[in-house]
Amino acid sequence: AMKGNTKRSVQMTRSGAFGLQHYGTFSWSGDILASWQEMKQQVPSGLNYSLCGIPFWNTDLGGFFYWEFEQDPKNPALQELQTRWMEWGTFMPLMRNHCSSPMVSELYLFGKEGDWAYDAMKKFIRLRYRLLPYIYSNAGAAVQHSNTLMRALVMDYAHDRKAATRNDEYLFGRNLLVKPVTDPMYTWKDDNKRGHLIYPDVKQAAAPVEVYLPEGNDWYDFWTNERLNGGQTLRRPCPIDIMPGYVKAGSNPPGGTDGQESAGKTW
């Protein structure tokens, strides 16, 4: 069916083996449980996949089975998990949420304008569109030069022993260091799987997240533009709409405007 077709096709596939990168495929981690433990395990899973030389990988954002949260998008505990997973998805090769019925994980079901979960997720969806030129250029490098998009720190900082042991943060492309938030800060869940806010205002519960900045170059905080020395461990406060991110000093990642769909981009 593709004979004579000059379009570059892509296919999603659950399974594969060494050499999968030879074909136009995206893989994902299968039907996983919506839980903090599962999310935390997905980070090294994606890095291991990339270390095998397969660059295009993703997860079901938020997980696939929502049994642990009553399958209710209004459950505050689920809203926090979904928000953090969507934030992480902004820095995956493919950003895609998907789940098992009767649960539906569309943004508008988690709230409305002015609600903390809705606003945070919308912020990162828009950021994804602004990052598309950077993502596209790194995807091209993956195809043409056998690179990967999710880069375990050991790939670029093998001389840095601390970096080599980190499996909870990575370089997205060559120039963006990201650290997914994989623990709850704002909610707790009772024995009936119902979530509750720890504080009435989620801004009161912003806890710090430990981030290691590899040595060998300086880094700029993605959100504040503060310049920081490499080779140090930070405790970065993370409000619900912030995920730790750092830009490698001396780089200039291309960006663009947000939009409704990638087809509307002119680059």
Region annotations inferred by a language model:
Residues 1-243, 248:
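Catalytic-domain carbohydrate-binding cleft regions of carbohydrate-active enzymes
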Residues 242-267:
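Accessory, solvent-exposed terminal regions and/or long lumenal/extracellular loops of proteins
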